[in-house]
Regions:
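Small beta-barrel nucleic-acid-binding modules, primarily SNase/OB-fold domains
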Residues: 2-158
């Protein structure tokens, strides 16, 4: 007997179809889930431009851990630790992290504006709105970040 759905009889194509289908469903559903801006509790400031927050919908809708990391879109902050190119960059990264931690700690209202997902996976891209001010703008204004939109990054080792 010949199947109408011959494409799905091959195991590889079947799983590909399932993945594509789930991707479409998630893409359509995430627009509903990520209505902007959202108020969630900050769990951790990873570095100057990455903040982790409680995201209960991750577990409720997707069955994933309820914490999501947001990288601030449109900025480049220095790298810290082993990713720093020089001691000066690491020091600047520590200062950027301290600035973000302090801003979050003093905030009365923190909102997350989610725009996209990170190409490296596991994070979303957007902005953190702290008492009505965008973290991206605060980081740049106070010298802890540079505007960045995909061009070649400038060195922090000057």
């Amino acid at each position: 007997m010949t199947s109408k759905f011959k494409f799905f009889t091959d195991r590889k194509h079947f799983f590909l179809g399932v993945i594509v289908g789930l991707s479409i469903v998630l893409a359509l559903g995430i627009g509903q889930v990520f209505a902007n801006p959202y108020n969630y509790k900050v769990v951790k400031v990873s570095d100057g431009d990455t903040v982790q927050f409680e995201a209960p919908f991750m577990q409720q809708y997707l069955g994933l851990k309820p914490v999501l990391a947001l990288r601030v879109l449109g900025v480049d902050t220095p790298e810290k630790g082993g990713r720093a190119q020089c001691p000066q960059e690491d020091a600047k990264a520590q200062a950027a992290s301290a600035f973000t931690k302090d801003a979050v700690a003093k905030a009365k209202v923190i909102q997350f504006e989610i725009k996209d997902h990170d190409k490296f996976g596991g994070r979303v891209l957007g902005d953190v709105i702290i008492d009505g001010q965008r973290l991206s703008e605060l980081l740049i204004k106070n010298g802890y970040a540079r505007a960045y939109f995909g061009e070649k990054k400038q060195s922090w080792c000057n």
